[in-house]
Every structure is written in structure tokens, then in C-alpha cells.
């Protein structure tokens, strides 16, 4: 394979008399042939002479092709490259990659710690939200279970695989459920606990009774 070919650069001690560039990829030429057009082409009020770069020569040739009566000029090019060379001004600053890698590793470690802390919190809330409790004996125990379920549901993070634009989170008497658009229900066993009211309603449901028996007459004939 061919190696990288570095383009040849031409330099001028005085620099271009128009843009003041001291280096160019093309040769510098004498400005005597173009000095008569400097005033109209570049909007100069003084005479300039010396070397001229190829870019400024092309601007003069372009100005000559303008239609008659055109007032366009390239005054913004005058002394545009005066001062430090183009190579030094466009040289990018070296970034310390070591410090950047350290910052990335610190951020990753912080994210890992936070993720572990969230997992531990979720585990503690799920373990406290589903204890083996006896049936409700008083209103006070009902209120305690409701507050416990509410606190655990608030602290438990939402599962990442749920599309919250489709599943809507709803709080009912038995805990937290996720309901879809067409009536389907998604239940998380850690956040759902049948309450006493539903159990009592199921137990107190009257059984279906058969037809009433006919009265038996005891009168003798």
C-alpha cells in the first residue's frame, strides 16, 4: 500500500501582499501583473506590491469575469490571514485521555452502586409487602396493611419491560394492578394482596336454593 503523501507547501518571507498568507499549497508570484486591478477587486485605498498567493490571483481573475457595472469586491480577504500561521491557529488541543477515562470509570461505578441500592430497596419492599398475615380482625389492621401497600408501591420501581403508553397503573383496594386498553389486567404478586372485603364477599355469597317444598296436609279424610 502507498504511504500517506504530504502535500508540498510553498512559503514567502514577506507573505501575500493582499491576504498576508505566508504559506500556500501553490507558488507565490509577483503582483506586478495584477496591481492595476487591486483597487477595484479588493477595495484597497493604498497601493500594494510584492508576492501574491494563487488564491488571490484566482480572485482577480474571477473579478474580471463579473458583468459590467457590478460593484462586488473581495475586501473581506484583505489581511485576513495576518498574524499566526494557519497551522498554529487550527492546531487542536490535546485532551488528556487518562482523566477522561477516570471520569468514565467513576460514573460507571456510581451507576452500579445506585443500581444495587435500588435492587436492595425493591427486595426489602417486596418482602415487607407480602408477609403471611392472618385475616383482618379490626379496622386498625386494615389501615396498617393499606399504608404498607401504598408505601411499598411508591418505592417499588416500574418494570422496564412495561409499555406505560399501553398499560395504565391503577390502585385498588387489593393493591396495584396494570390495566390495558382492552380491559386486560396485569398483576404483580408482590404488589397485589387480596383484601378482607373481597374474601368476605366470596364467603358470604348465598348459595342457590332449590324450589320450596309443598306443604303437607295433616287433615284426615
Swiss-Prot record:
GO CC entries: nucleus; Sin3-type complex
Positions with biased composition (Basic and acidic residues): 111-121
Region (Disordered): 110-153, 201-221
InterPro entries (alphabetical): FAM60A (IPR026065)
Biased composition (Low complexity): 124-135
Single Gene Ontology BP annotation: positive regulation of cell population proliferation
Keywords: Nucleus
Compositional bias (Polar residues): 136-153
Subcellular location, record wording: Nucleus
Expression by tissue: Embryonic stem cells (at protein level).
UniProt function note: Subunit of the Sin3 deacetylase complex (Sin3/HDAC), this subunit is important for the repression of genes encoding components of the TGF-beta signaling pathway. Core component of a SIN3A complex (composed of at least SINHCAF, SIN3A, HDAC1, SAP30, RBBP4, OGT and TET1) present in embryonic stem (ES) cells. Promotes the stability of SIN3A and its presence on chromatin and is essential for maintaining the potential of ES cells to proliferate rapidly, while ensuring a short G1-phase of the cell cycle, thereby preventing premature lineage priming.
Subunit structure: Component of the Sin3/HDAC corepressor complex at least composed of BRMS1, BRMS1L, ING2, SAP30, SAP30L, HDAC1. Found in a complex composed of at least SINHCAF, SIN3A, HDAC1, SAP30, RBBP4, OGT and TET1. Interacts with SIN3A and OGT.
Family: Belongs to the SINHCAF family.
Protein name as annotated: SIN3-HDAC complex-associated factor
Organism of derivation: Mus musculus (Mouse)
Gene transcribed to yield this protein: Sinhcaf
